């Protein structure tokens, strides 16, 4: 699974062009999903572009409102996402945890809303810079992962993104990534009997470090931000998977 998270970047034309170019450049592998998460206002346009050329790219949302309907200006709910045939949704990204004060209770409501609607979840976790030692990191991640208790993990992918590595150019290092991904998989198996839990890595992923990260048996894919906006760079990273 290789995911392009556009955040609040790009225009409709940029995204349509990206879909066309990536669809031509990637050496699509049935077992490696290629996902674009554009801004919500471009979900419909992205879906139309994907369908028009019968692209293997799958569509993801950056957000989901926990209720089916309600008074949340700017919200987007599961029914709306299904109208665009949205296959994935990001939940728990550190930027939303930080800037929108999202906690475990609201994240669980979003999680349930997505699963009930048949939308696969990419659940994001990660530690801040003051918790970079292994024990503090693991304790923090356990708390974040507690949201998944009593949940069928079959439609959930974990995205490990250390907060201090997002958009900073700092990479966690392959030994740290392998250690934390292994910990996540072992810990989740204590919450659920699903033995095929996928864990992808995010945080300053670039073309020059992606091959090493993907070479780890504990890494099942990548969640890429800024580097993914360039179709050529993203396609080259995907083709390494």
List where the protein language model places each region.
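Active-site loop-to-helix "anion-binding N-cap" substructures in soluble metabolic enzymes
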Residues: 1-241
